[in-house]
Amino acid sequence: MDAIVNAANSQMLGCFIPMHMCIDNQIHTYAGVQLREECSHKMEELRAKYGSYYEQPTSVPMITAAYNLPAKNVIHVVGPIVRNRLTSELEQELADCYTNVLNMCLENNLRSVAFCCISTGVFRFPNKRAAEIAVDTVQKWLVENPNAMERVIFNVFKEEDKKYYEEILQ
């Protein structure tokens, strides 16, 4: 696998809640400390450029090595946070996450990517709607960029998500 996608937080340093089951924590744990070090270095460079309070914007991906993971790269992206209700702006931000990750794959000559369910955990994006947006966005991108990718995987954690993706992809 050329890249796996990490649903990151805006600090881009991984989850700091011990034993937390979010994908961000799992990726940083299994990749090894080198991943957190690379993320920290990249964020230091961005803070030097944009100011000490810089946080990674929603839908803007960042690529790193994957270290101990069975992939070449990790593409970290901050998904939208649903605070009160789902809006069309939040839906567009989620679609932008998928589009921007695929564009980053294209720019870096990566031909396979595994997406996690972006924003459906603690960021509270409704799971079914997130799956619909993910599949629709990826399918449209693949039509617009034929032969750009050899393999796109939707990797799910919950049975609920598996059911949604299976229904949508039929």
Give the residues covered by each predicted segment.
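Macrodomain-like recognition of ADP-ribose-binding/processing modules
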Residues: 1-170
